[in-house]
A protein has these predicted regions:
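Pocket-lining segment of extracytoplasmic ligand-binding domains
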Residues: 89, 164, 169-272
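Extracytoplasmic small-molecule ligand-binding "clamshell" domains
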Residues: 28-34, 41-87, 250-254, 346
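Extracytoplasmic
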Residues: 28-30, 40, 56-58, 68-71, ...
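Pocket-flanking alpha-helical
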Residues: 50, 62-106, 183-187, 203-211
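Segments of small-molecule ligand-sensing domains
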Residues: 251, 255-352
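C-terminal segment of classical bacterial N-terminal signal peptides
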Residues: 13-22
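A structural signal for short loop-to-beta-strand junctions that line the ligand-binding cleft
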Residues: 105-119, 124, 247-255
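Bilobed "Venus flytrap"/periplasmic-binding protein-like clamshell domains
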Residues: 30-54, 122-186, 190, 307
């Protein structure tokens, strides 16, 4: 009996010894960042932030996968604990356009969101079968195209690009909304698809992981900026180069491509403790930026902390913007009930 009592006392003493450490661990703010698919670039960028930035800011950052940018807007707005989101520029702009056009839900979602910083350009890949007659993006009109899951940034980019290039939406009979993996099976095995659209910053894990034999099954379509259809697209998107060095198992030479800008976004928080925590995050982001560029995903080398002027309707989050600008100045850091449109469905604004 005495031995049991002694054991209980020792256990209690040990628990009290560890209590300060446990309390200290609990002071880390349990925040979340929503990214995209497990095999995409967004989630790798999120993990870099969790590793190199969050700890110094006193944040325990959970990096969560998602369907993509449109879902991220909704989760940032409504999901408890989600303080950061990765969002593509065309998705953000589409919500603003829907708001301007009178879509009340779009306004409720997008108006309180604020930009932390622009990140980098994400390449938009158009994948066809190796034996396909298609060679260029401007040739995909009337093709059967997988645009990615609803609520994904990929779906927004694919449908917006198509609409801009060919003056109309992809017909529903030709559009599918499968995951990348499911779509590639439909493309190469079932042959019920002609094109699979993937959006990811290079080197994209999905393509990097492909074996040399993949070249016999698939190819990447080139983007010819000189074509009339292409010229309509570059008003919203950006010319890019898909490098053979990024995908040696797929490419023997660099090919011309197209890209969309990625942004790190938050909410217009007003609670004092949250504002202070986000200011610490911004300070840590600046202070650890060199580590992100040297040890993080290669896309960090394309990021610039200068915070350029944003488009109409886009707003920075002032407490974080002030912190970043102050830090960079000192450190000189470089570098409704109706028929739903396709865009509304992609954004998750269709309730029918």
């Amino acid at each position: 009996m005495h031995l049991k009592l002694i054991g209980l006392c020792l256990a209690a003493a040990a628990a009290m010894q560890h209590a300060p450490a446990m309390a200290q661990a609990q002071t880390q703010a349990p925040y979340k960042i929503v990214t995209a698919s497990e095999r995409g670039t967004y989630i790798q960028i999120g993990r870099d932030i969790a590793k190199f930035v969050a700890p110094t800011a006193g944040i325990d950052l959970a990096v969560l996968p998602s369907a993509g940018s449109a879902e991220n807007v909704q989760r940032l707005r409504y999901e408890p604990g989600v303080k950061f989101a990765m969002v593509q520029s065309d998705v953000y702009q589409a919500f603003l356009d829907q708001d301007k056009g009178g879509n009340v839900e779009a306004g409720v979602l997008i108006r309180p969101l604020r930009v932390i910083m622009p990140l980098y350009n994400e390449e938009i890949y158009f994948i066809a079968r190796a034996d396909s007659e298609l060679e260029f993006v401007h040739q995909i009109k009337e093709a059967k195209i997988n645009v990615g899951p609803l609520l994904s940034g990929t779906a927004m980019s694919a449908t917006t690009l198509y609409r801009q290039m060919f003056n109309g939406p992809i017909t529903e009979v030709n559009a599918s909304y499968l995951s990348n993996e499911e779509a590639l099976v439909k493309l190469t095995v079932d042959k019920t698809l002609d094109v699979v659209v993937v959006v990811a910053g290079q080197p994209a894990k999905l393509l990097v992981d492909m074996k040399p034999e993949a070249r016999k099954l698939i190819k990447l379509l080139k983007f010819d900026a000189s074509q009339p259809e292409s010229q309509a697209a570059v008003k919203t998107y950006f010319p890019a180069t898909v490098r053979a060095a990024s995908y040696p198992n797929l490419l023997t030479e660099d090919i011309p491509g197209i890209a969309v800008k990625a942004y790190l976004v938050t909410y217009d928080y007003g609670l004092g403790s949250t504002v202070a925590q986000l200011r610490q995050f911004a300070r840590s982001l600046c202070q650890n930026f060199a580590a992100l560029q040297t040890s993080g995903h290669p896309k960090w080398r394309e990021v610039d902390l200068s915070l350029p002027e944003l488009g109409r309707g886009w707003l920075y989050y002032p407490p974080m913007a002030r912190e970043i600008r102050s830090c960079t100045a000192g450190k000189r850091v470089a570098v409704p009930s109706k028929t739903c449109t396709q865009q509304e469905r992609v954004l998750g604004l269709c309730k029918q």
